[in-house]
Amino acid sequence: MSKRVYEIAKELDLDTKEVIGRLNAAGIEVKNHFATVEDPDYERVFGGGNGRSEAGEERGRKGRQKKRRRVVIDASATNRGPRAAAPSRPSRGRGAAREEAPAAEEREAPEVVRVEPGATVRDLGEALGVPPTRIIQILMGLGEMKTVTQTLSTEEIELVAEELGRRVEVGALEEPAPEEIGPEDSPEDLVEKPPVITVMGHVDHGKTSLLDRIRRTNVVSGEAGGITQHIGAYQVEHEGRRITFIDTPGHEAFTEMRARGARVTDIVVLVVAADDGVMPQTEEAIEHARAAGVPIVVAINKIDVPNANPDRVMGELAERGLTPEQWGGETVTVPVSAKTGEGIEDLLENILVVAELEELRANPKAPASGYVIESRLDPGRGPVATLLLNRGTLHRGDVVLAGTAYGRVRAMFDYTGQRIKEAGPGTPVEILGLSGVPEAGTRFEVAENERAARSRAQQAEERLRRQELAASGPRRTTLEELLGEGGAEELNLVVKADVAGSVEALKEALAKLSTDEVRVNVVRSGVGAVTDSDIMLASASGGIVIGFNVRPTNTAKQVAEREGVEIRTYDVIYKVIEEIEAAMKGMLAPETAERETATAEVRATFRVPNVGTVAGCYVTSGEIRRNNRVRVVRDGTVVYDGQIASLKRFKDDVRTVREGFECGVGIENFNDVKEGDVLEFYEVVEIPR
């Protein structure tokens, strides 16, 4: 195993120039930081501790002292160039010089500049305050040829900074916090808002059926596989008051979507089947609700089935800290039947009671803000986003900013599809007019004007672009680095879906498929049809394209055929997971196993000139094949394992010898075969995984 010079320097806390100097002094020629050093050479030069000199120790101590005083500067706020040196003051004597020494040392402490992964040569130059040409010169000295627009790896960024005597941290820059919208709300401006309810629970426990009964609409029949594929927000009225429901999918593949739902909700309705009890996703939903700090109302569903046992369910809930009110606890528990409608009115009544206790209020006079619940690209209407308002009132014509998407609200629809002009807190609305499809779960707010919204959206897009470049760029450029990964394979995927919620669910599910041997890497994901750009990225990364409820464009099909890129389309998420697992098994190197083909006894040995020792054998079982391997066993111990050099019957070369026949066997590179030895013949077969 070998190490690179910069890895040795980092491991021993030495300067890379010192490492290069020591290696060259020991007669090991290395030219730059990327040069490799074999283990024997490493042990010879640096063995017996870290091999640091006293000067190196002193420099390390000083470096650690300076490290304590580091100042972190974002690349976006760094100075345009190197600081001007402060004019030195005349010394007033030795004592004065000694007093000023610590201050001088403090000034020497290098500032730490934070640089984003995937930064280009130009970006790094701007961050460090040096011309890009200087960066290129340093890289050329390291044996790397780069242009100003090419991205740099983390190692390259760190090495360039070290050459310049600067310190960098490579990591995503913090996204600017959303601007505060006005002063703190005054109590007289606060009004009661509809409670936002998230329905959670185990798959097939009847969440969507329960909402269907409440809404009097049929959602289940429209979902592929009968399972909710993305989040929808709806409102119902009960006793003149509105309640907003969010339906989160229940399968474990949708963990991330459920967690997002819990963040924007006021109350969680936990659906548990009376005949099934608490299941893994039920416990997961409880954890999400507790993490979000929201109250839980339990709906024990399917009380109409013959083997329903609500008391057992209550006992299981009590074991998990949700003691029902009927048992003297604080958890509201309502037995219901989505099929017959029993208990539905009682459930809605209890939800409103809990909402009153929570005192859910918001300021409708403030500029609107909230979260994107769902988004998609509609062929006829363009980007469509479902928003849930937490605060303020959204009007038609307002400029909305949501991550990388922005735009003026051209049209707004309520949960029934009716056009509306404004919407208040706790209300889900569907809007048109955005420049793109925002990610589900993104915070949105009303911007002052389109120019301000465009500027902030471009900043967010630039951050996203850098992250994509860092994720999909060529990370393994040399044969040594490829071999250094232990032969691990990588399955690169481009994921496209009809709605953002499905994209998130797919990414979450695919990430769980990664193993030590095969990594699943989503190089790009998005909403909308599969385009030629997606195909080219998949081709460049050696991956495939996954389309969920979307189809490739005609151009994309042509490009895919030309580039040899496979496009797979699905409408149920479980099919995606199953087929990707199968593809991963095909990528794994096949396992090997030995299969014994024959055994033979050595009854005599013959010395043949120019050939060596030949074993005269009697085949006791099986059939010897010329291409078999042979194992020599003496007194129960294997003394040699190798290839057959020759296989003869009398004086003729043969390809096989069956059981009960005699033959002569020559063994490659082995002449110590003796009478009485046992020869085991076998073949190595590959077992696909």
Swiss-Prot record:
Q: Which Pfam families match?
A: EF-G_D2 (PF22042), GTP_EFTU (PF00009), GTP_EFTU_D2 (PF03144), IF-2 (PF11987), IF2_N (PF04760)
Could you list this entry's UniProt keywords, alphabetically sorted. Cytoplasm, GTP-binding, Initiation factor, Nucleotide-binding, Protein biosynthesis
Location of region: Disordered:
41-109
Its domain of life? Bacteria
Q: Where is this region: G4?
A: 301-304
Keyword GTP-binding (UniProt): yes
Annotated spans, G3 = 247-250
Q: Where is the composition biased (Low complexity)?
A: 80-94
This molecule's function is given as: One of the essential components for the initiation of protein synthesis. Protects formylmethionyl-tRNA from spontaneous hydrolysis and promotes its binding to the 30S ribosomal subunits. Also involved in the hydrolysis of GTP during the formation of the 70S ribosomal complex.
Q: What is this protein called?
A: Translation initiation factor IF-2
Question: Origin organism of this chain?
Answer: Rubrobacter xylanophilus (strain DSM 9941 / JCM 11954 / NBRC 16129 / PRD-1)
Gene name on record? infB
